[in-house]
Amino acid sequence: MLFFDAYTLEGNFRVFTIEKERFFMTKSQKTTHHLTVAALLSAVAAVLQFVEFSIPVMPAFIKLDVSDLPALLGTFSLGPVYGVAIQLVKNLLHLPFGSSAGVGELSNFLLGAVFAFIAGLIYQRHKSRAGALWGSLAGAATMALISLPINYFIVYPAYVVLYGLPLEGIVGMYEAILGAVAHVPTQNALLNCLLVFNVPFTLCKGLLDVALCFLIYKPLSPLLHK
């Protein structure tokens, strides 16, 4: 009886050990896969950041790109923390090639991180197509709203200091497109420009990323979740 109990105990211990090793091996493989996918998405995002287009209704220094798309793919497939990490790595890779002394990269990271984190956080709690849609829409809307204080308090003041650009000259670029838009709806010229141009532009940029994400996510899903 004692021999049987000892034999059974030894067998159970072996099973436990095997299952434990299998668990840690699976977890390690999963982490490795996540890091690999995140690295690839970061590289793609960095490349996309160089592919930018001018928009006729925006000042020439504001460009459109879809470099937030890989972070959106990452936040849905890997989690919100990975989405933020992809945004960080993307901008670090772009930093040596940028011409804004890091201001543009900082702004891009802050806005993109908010976008990816909120989208991923909502999807994490509501894992469905509807959850992904509402999460990404909420992320895009929040990014657009946050762009107002970031541009007003950080980006444009930094450009004035770093490049010696008069604020009136920056506002003039906006006015040249839509007349005296800088005089409505508030008495603050720069604030008006950001409200009329930058916030809607940032929202549309986010919505474009959302549309592209929903278009390509399913075909890429086997690679993202392999």
Show which residues each predicted segment covers.
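Loop-helix junctions at membrane interfaces
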Residues: 2-226
